[in-house]
Amino acid sequence: MPKKAIISGVYNTKVGEVPGSTAMSLHAEAARGAIADAGLKLADVDGVLCAYVITETYPMLSSAFCEYVGIQPNFNAGVNAGGATGAIMVMQAAAMVEAGICKHV
């Protein structure tokens, strides 16, 4: 039976200027919030996709993010597709789940 991908958790951070926050800390907050909303633990996540940011430089953002939050995924990648980045990331996550590469992205 083919696997069907779903969005099981969501979370929104504050937007705009958020004193005391970095792009990485906001990425981490969003990830932890979405993981909790899905009823999962960090250890359940086996795939990671990160959107690049223009305010801070991380040559390997997705790998740096995984280290920052303590995730050891089977797959991780940074995505930069301009205004389509969010949609592309959802499509990539669904493809990885449906192909059986990952369970939780």
Question: Where on the chain are the PLM-derived regions?
Answer:
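Active-site-proximal alpha-helical scaffold in enzymes
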Residues: 81-105
